[in-house]
Structure formats: structure tokens, C-alpha cells
Design a protein with these regions (language model features):
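A structural "flexibility-hinge" signal
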Residues: 1-188
Length: 188
């Protein structure tokens, strides 16, 4: 099975990056690098959320009821109104009160200013959920299958970009134990 992360990243072609960069006030390279850092982090946080039955079922129900992937049918159109979309609410569920810390960590890791990074995450969250919802639907996944998919995505991200994921983990690892998992758990 192809990586969800790669499928999401492949949606950001030159035209899409140009539009998004214009909205964020950044260049395409900075935007592309920030997307490449933010998508695996979002997938990892969602994976962590599926670590218990309640979180797994909650994510499954959200995907089943609200995120069928239709957003992907007109991505350029969505980008035009993304700040009014469901992204802020999704981020609130995923990161809770630690959202600002996540934004600041990604900002430091990528060089994108925190304000632009926050707006980028608001834009990316519904896209990631749309991909997961569409994949869940196409593959007939139940809650356990979804948790397995997200766990595989987290492993793939670690293997594909160990340096980047290591940098992000260092910024998120507030207690210095070498893992951001406990901090992500506290965020969820």
C-alpha cells in the first residue's frame, strides 16, 4: 500500500504550492519544507490518539461522519477558504491546549514564522483527515485497521526522514527522555 504521507505530499504541485505560499507570505521552498514536516507530525499525533479504544473510536467516527475525502476533489478551491474551514477544530482535538507549542516547535524546525505555520496547520488538518477518511472508506477499514494504518505511517515517517523526525521529536520532547510520545499523549 502506498504511503498516505506520500499521497498527501504529492497533492502539493507547483500551482498548489504557489497558491498556498501566496496566502502564507512565504516562498514555495519554505512552504514545501513546512508541509513535509507538518504532515508526518499530524499523522503521528493522530496515530497516538488511536492508542486507546476511546481515541481510536472517536477518530474513526469523525472520519466516517465528517471526512469522506470530498475536500480532495477540489483542493485548490478548498485552499481559497481553508481558514474558514474545520482545521482549527481538528487541531484542537489533535493537540489540545498544546497547539501553540506544536506550532512553535514546527516553526523552529522549518524556519517558517509561527503565524504562517499556524495557518498552514489549519489548512493541512482537514486535508490529512480527508485522505484518511477516503482511505478508510475505499479499503473498508474498521477502527483497528485505521489504527494499524496510522501506526504504519508513523514508522514510515521515521524511516523516510529520520533526521527531520528526530528534529521534531527534540523540539517536542519537553522532558528530555528522548521521545515525544509522552508529550504527544499529553496533548491528545
Amino acid at each position: 500500500m502506498a504511503s498516505i504521507m506520500n499521497a498527501i505530499l504529492s497533492q502539493f504541485d507547483s500551482d498548489t504550492l504557489d497558491q498556498l505560499s501566496g496566502q502564507l507570505g512565504t516562498n514555495q521552498q519554505t512552504t514545501g519544507n513546512a508541509i513535509a514536516a507538518a504532515v508526518p507530525l499530524l499523522l503521528s499525533a493522530l496515530s497516538r490518539n488511536t492508542g486507546d479504544v476511546q481515541g481510536r473510536d472517536s477518530l474513526y467516527n469523525a472520519l466516517s461522519n465528517d471526512h469522506d475525502g470530498g475536500i480532495l476533489d477540489n483542493l485548490i478551491g478548498f485552499l481559497g477558504g481553508a481558514q474558514q474551514g474545520p482545521g482549527q477544530g481538528i487541531l484542537g482535538h489533535v493537540f489540545g491546549g498544546s497547539q501553540n507549542g506544536v506550532v512553535n516547535a514546527l516553526s523552529k524546525a522549518t524556519g517558517m514564522d509561527a503565524s504562517s505555520m499556524g495557518r498552514l496547520l489549519v489548512t493541512l488538518a482537514p486535508i490529512v483527515m480527508g485522505f484518511l477518511g477516503r482511505t478508510r472508506q475505499q479499503q473498508g477499514m474498521g477502527p483497528s485497521g485505521l489504527a494499524g494504518l496510522l501506526g504504519g505511517e508513523t514508522e514510515y515517517a521515521q524511516q523516510a526522514a529520520p533526521g527531520l523526525m528526530g528534529t521534531i521529536n527534540r523540539f517536542l520532547d519537553q522532558n528530555g527522555n528522548g521521545s515525544a510520545v509522552d508529550e504527544l499523549a499529553g496533548m491528545l
